[in-house]
């Protein structure tokens, strides 16, 4: 099957501009969506349950008589787990265990514990770590049902010590996804409401008589959900506004080209705007990958999506060497970075910007998506330059601790008063000086 993927060469004139054109993506804001979301959020904030019920019945074609009727009991989650095929249940439980194990280790290693120290004059300084009280988890419904995302969002929140996890998931026409509900149970979700869209985001942000207000909202969704999350940010925290999925493969030419082709497919099949790029110093290997793509594409159920993605936003790039590949990779700052090489550790030392780094030819990105353990909620659209994967640290907050002794009040008071007078803030200065006299 014929497919045309953009091919670039880093030695060619105009390469930098061509690469920028490949990477260019700006999420468009649909004015109709923005207006609709603004109206829905205002309505939910004003009318609470009544608005949530009205929108849910309309958009999901339901006939519920109350929002309370849209909450699923824990028994329903247990029934969903018990009803899974044995292999599906075993896989889900294994993935949950691995994700939990990784994030428990992360909690130990990543500064998620309170600390303090005492100065010579008795003054105590430190930091208090507190988990969030309540977190909301948005889960897409219908065809885009991803139980793995439930695990990746719920488990780090649970490990962090979040008091309550509230999940919302739409059920169009009343159809529930047992894998999603089973994942909610395994992930430690406390409450599940079968609501979705902007109205669900509004309910979580503002609270209603039935749906409790949360402190942070996490999880993927469509354009309406993304718009709603942007609008409620500030009232609550959010994880991120994710762009299209991305994979960048750095290969030294020693991997089976069909493996690389399928890795590129693994992101391209998400949607037409997903981006899959190969960097390789071996021109003949790039040709073999190109051939493998053409041979394998007809066997893919989502071949039309893959084709559109690869032709529209994909690229096969010839580089001078692996050192240059690493430099370009840092500029791209991809969501997923595979280093498919004989000595991946050597090259990983040169990588500064990537959401997740997959080392070695046996480490397919899909293993990270589902069951390796690290979180698959990753920064996209070059935000890996300043952002990190979702983790335990996203569900805690830090408070500074200051306990000043009498001696410390004199020493620090002189400094504070001098600076406060310099800023023209007399009450600040006097507040410090009063304690110097005591």
Swiss-Prot record:
- EC number(s): the record gives 1.1.1.23
Protein name as it appears in the record: Histidinol dehydrogenase
Where Zn(2+) is bound, by residue? 267, 270, 369, 428
Family, according to the entry, reads as follows: Belongs to the histidinol dehydrogenase family.
Q: Which UniProt keywords apply?
A: Amino-acid biosynthesis, Histidine biosynthesis, Metal-binding, NAD, Oxidoreductase, Zinc
- Entry GO CC: cytosol
UniProt cross-references to HAMAP family, sorted A to Z: HisD (MF_01024)
Q: Which PROSITE patterns match?
A: HISOL_DEHYDROGENASE (PS00611)
Q: How is the cofactor bound, in the record's words?
A: Binds 1 zinc ion per subunit.
Query: Gene of origin?
Result: hisD
High-level lineage:
Bacteria, Pseudomonadati, Pseudomonadota, Betaproteobacteria, Burkholderiales
**Organism, as annotated:** Burkholderia multivorans (strain ATCC 17616 / 249)
The family database entries (Gene3D superfamilies) matched by this protein are listed as: 1.20.5.1300, Nitrogenase molybdenum iron protein domain
């Amino acid at each position: 099957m014929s497919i045309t993927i953009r091919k670039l060469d880093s030695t060619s004139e105009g390469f930098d501009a061509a690469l920028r054109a490949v990477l260019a993506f700006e999420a468009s804001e649909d004015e109709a969506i923005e207006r609709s979301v603004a109206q829905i959020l205002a309505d939910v904030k004003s009318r609470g349950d009544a608005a949530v019920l009205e929108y849910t019945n309309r958009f999901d074609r339901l006939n519920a008589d109350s929002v309370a009727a849209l909450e699923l009991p824990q028994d329903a989650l247990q029934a969903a787990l018990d009803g899974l095929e044995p292999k599906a249940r075993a896989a889900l439980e294994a993935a949950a265990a691995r994700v939990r194990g990784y994030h428990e280790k992360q909690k130990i290693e990543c500064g998620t514990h309170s600390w303090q120290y005492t100065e010579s004059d008795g003054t105590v300084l430190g930091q208090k770590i507190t988990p969030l009280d309540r977190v909301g988890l948005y889960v897409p419904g219908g065809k885009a049902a991803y139980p793995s995302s439930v695990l990746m969002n719920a488990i780090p929140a649970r490990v962090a010590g979040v008091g309550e996890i509230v999940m919302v998931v739409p059920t169009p026409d009343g159809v529930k996804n047992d894998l999603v509900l089973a994942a909610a149970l395994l992930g430690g979700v406390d409450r599940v409401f079968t609501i979705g869209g902007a109205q669900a985001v509004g309910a979580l942000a503002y609270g209603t008589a039935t749906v409790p207000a949360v402190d942070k909202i996490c999880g993927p969704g469509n354009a309406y959900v993304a718009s709603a999350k942007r609008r409620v940010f500030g009232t609550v925290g959010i994880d991120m506004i994710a762009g299209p999925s991305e994979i960048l493969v750095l290969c030294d030419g020693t991997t089976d080209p069909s493996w690389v082709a399928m890795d590129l497919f693994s992101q391209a099949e998400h949607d037409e705007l997903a981006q899959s790029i190969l960097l390789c110093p071996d021109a003949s290997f790039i040709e073999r990958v190109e051939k493998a793509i053409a041979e394998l594409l007809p066997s893919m159920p989502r071949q039309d999506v893959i084709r559109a993605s690869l032709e529209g936003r994909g690229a096969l790039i010839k580089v001078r060497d692996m050192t240059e590949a690493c430099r370009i990779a840092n500029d791209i700052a991809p969501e997923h970075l595979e280093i498919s090489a004989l000595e991946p550790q050597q090259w990983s030392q040169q990588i500064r910007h990537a959401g997740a780094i997959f080392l070695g030819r046996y480490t397919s990105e899909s293993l990270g998506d589902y069951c390796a353990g690290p979180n698959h909620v990753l920064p996209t659209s070059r935000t890996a330059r300043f952002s990190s994967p979702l983790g335990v640290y996203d569900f805690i907050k830090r408070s500074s601790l200051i306990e000043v002794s009498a001696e410390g009040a004199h020493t620090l008071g002189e400094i504070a008063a001098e600076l406060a007078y310099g800023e023209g803030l007399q009450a600040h200065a006097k507040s410090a000086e009063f304690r110097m006299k005591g």
